[in-house]
Amino acid sequence: MQKWYKYVGFGAILLSLASCFEKKHEVMVAPWGVIEDTIPTTDEFDLHDIQTSGELIMATVSGPQTYYEYHGKYLGTQFLICQRFADSLGVRLRVEVYRDSLELVKRQAEGEVDIVAWPTPGHIDADTAKNDLAKELQGWYHPGLIAAVQKEENDLLTVRKVSRRIFSPMLDAKGGVISHYDQFFMAYARDIRWDWRLLAAQCYQESTFDPRAVSFAGAKGLMQIMPGTADHLGVSRSKLYEPEANIQAAVKYIGQLQNTFKDIRDNYERTNFVLASYNGGAHHIRDAMNLAKRDAKNPHRWSDVAPYVLKLAQPQYYNDPIVKYGYMRGSETVDYVQRIRQRHAGYQGVKTKFMGFHSSKPRKADKRKNKYDLKD
């Protein structure tokens, strides 16, 4: 038995399908050029086996062309193409992310994956030893596919990301009313020792105070809680459109993030990191902190870390060995923190008759255990 691979040009990705077989050589002509083909006389795991197992395994690296997570939704041109291909086969797609192309080649050579995808300059290739699967892929592919997939992704990233009604950022400044939900902000902000107006500012950034808001990724309600996050928090998905339940869930999650960043002693700075993590994910923010620390910056100061959040969109940074969670669209996260802080500054002039709940000065923490400590 020997391992042989076929290369198929797709325009900006390298797709590789691998298996073990004995070969005979054949030249094939496809819309994207001449292909050197190898047809197996035996094949250890091919199209029929994949359809029987119900799973197509894709191995890739993190990156904007390959595969990344954005607000709970997985994107990347290669991933979306492979997802469509898996759908056409009637199977689910499982994605395995590795550090570099050498690891991908190793997994391919060992027959552990069905498709390997990684970016190559200016074109997409595919190599395969699974002849049936390769022919299925060739017959399924059409020249307009990449453009269609890229348009789909760009539409998701550029159109309004949250379907929502736009409400005023402040209902009645003179009357001390920011929103219809101020009573809930006041009640629950105390649990995380936040000024309630900061929670209101974050809510406006998330949903513009629309309790029926829903994002393209499926986040719901005032504070845009993902269904999976609701499960983690023990909140019924059916209650995510209920204002109080949604705010309560968000506060519980914020409390967990505060615990995650308890190594940041300054409360104001820690809150910046919590806000950034609520938007972009705590793992990515930790990656940016590690990059900042490596470059002799203060990893506990947001102004030092924010530039590295932006840099996680650049290959030389998201491929750095110190980075564990890969590519990130950091510009939105940096903007998210800035906008909330600016809106909160505007809200701080709001007076309310409920004077007991809105002090902007954090209360002194007691020594009891944080109710939102994560379990190991």
What residue spans do the PLM features occupy?
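C-terminal motif of bacterial Sec signal peptides marking the signal peptidase cleavage site
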Residues: 16-19
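Extracytoplasmic small-molecule ligand-binding "clamshell" domains
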Residues: 26-120
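Export/targeting segments at the very N-terminus of extracytoplasmic proteins
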Residues: 37-38, 158-209, 247, 262-264, ...
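Hydrophobic residues within well-ordered alpha-helices
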Residues: 85, 108-109, 202, 206, ...
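Low-complexity, Gly/Ser/Thr/Pro-rich intrinsically disordered linker/tail segments
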Residues: 332-376
